[in-house]
Every structure is written in structure tokens, then in C-alpha cells.
Amino acid sequence: MAEEEVTYPVSIVLSLQREETAPLLRTMRSQHVLPALSHTWGSAQAYGVLLHQADTPLTVLDVPGPQWIEGLEQRVHALSNISSVVVLVPDHTEPAVLLSAGAANVIPRDTPVRELASRIAAERRWLDMRHSPQRPAADAQQYRSLRPRQYSQQVLFDILSSASRPWCCHDLCLLLGTAREPMSRRALQARTARLNERLMPYGISLDYTAQWGRTTFVGLVEGPGMDERRR
């Protein structure tokens, strides 16, 4: 059966170090729970899949080594805004802080193959039994004709137009950056400014507040954004 015809319980595998994740995916292939390929952290293609999935998306975030543990809770918090997240961690990693950050489950990545597959499949079943969607898609549908042509801008647009809760600029910088470093605040400001310029001729703008060195994005709004309305 062709790879694209297979439906997996997991929507996307995100890796903080793809070459270390590849052996895990090969080992798990016979269990039919994980896609055959992973995406790097910050992949616009991966986020696009998550943002357009009809049911609640499920992401496996693979953390191949202890060098990635510092600040991992911030990554989980940001990613959990667009997907349910199962985190595969090195042995002896404390799960409590990751669960508090929004992880649906935290599993040692050296868990026996069948047990790991069962726990991931159980997470998918639990998501499917939930009655309420994780995030509303009404705004994304309403503003679909306004989506930019550039793919990276499309992802930012989709994130903000389908937001079910406010986005802190620090979370966006982390989500849109690489495994090694987040996107700079200046780069995010430039990207959101370009998006705003595209939306304004249609009477739409980003809804946001800026205070104490932190910008919080709420979504899209008809008319000027919060900062401009307050001037």
C-alpha cells in the first residue's frame, strides 16, 4: 500500500534531531502507529498538516537526548496550542513539568515497541472519544480567501485566524524557529507586519496587545488591531 494511503493514529512526528529519530521510526514501522518520516521542529509543512486536520491532531514530539530537555516545557506549551502532544523523552526525564505545560502524555523513548505503540494508540482513541474539538476552525474558514501565497505566511495566518486562545509572541517565536534557536522578535514583528499589510485593504487586521515587552495575539478582527484602536 502506498505511504500516502496509510492512515496513522499520529498526525505528525516532530523531532528535535531527525537523524536520531530515524532509527526509532524504523523500529516502530511494524506497529503502524507512526508515519515513516519525521519533520524537524519549526517545519511549516508539519504545522500546515496539523492546522488543517479535520479531527483533533496528534503529534509525537521526539526528544532524542538530554541536551534537549532544558526549555522543553516551553516547546510543549507552544505546540499544544495547535495539537495534542505525546512527548517521547530520554529515560529518567521528569514528566510532571511537561504534563503541566500541556503534554497529553510523556513516555520514555526506550519503552518496548509494542507497549509504546499501545500507549500511543490509546491516546488516539481517547482523543476520538472527546466530544469537543480542541480548537474552532470558524475563523480559518471565514478568512480563507485572504490567505497569503507564501507558505510560511500561510502558516502564520492559519495559526492566528484559528486561535482558540491568545498567542504570546515568545511562544510564536519558539514554534516558528528551529530546534537550535527560536525566531527573533524582530523577524516575527516583520512577518506579522507584512501579514497586517495584506489584510488591511480587506478591513481585517491582527488583533493584538503590546505591553511590557510582550505582544499577545488574539486572532483576526474587522477594523484596526487593538493597539491602533487605543490610540
At which residue positions do the language-model features occur?
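Alpha4 helix (beta4-alpha4-beta5 surface) of REC/receiver domains from two-component response regulators
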Residues: P90-N105
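Receiver (REC) domain switch/output surface
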Residues: V106, E115-R130
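DNA-binding patch around the recognition helix
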Residues: R130-Y151, Q189-R231
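Short amphipathic alpha-helical recognition elements used for nucleic-acid or partner binding
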Residues: L146-A179, L195
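Conserved phosphotransfer microenvironments
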Residues: T21-A22, S43-S83, V87-E94
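Conserved acidic segment of CheY-like receiver
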Residues: A2-G42, T59-V63, V86
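A Lys-centered signature of the CheY-like receiver
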Residues: R109
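Receiver (REC) domain switch/active-site region of two-component response regulators
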Residues: P112
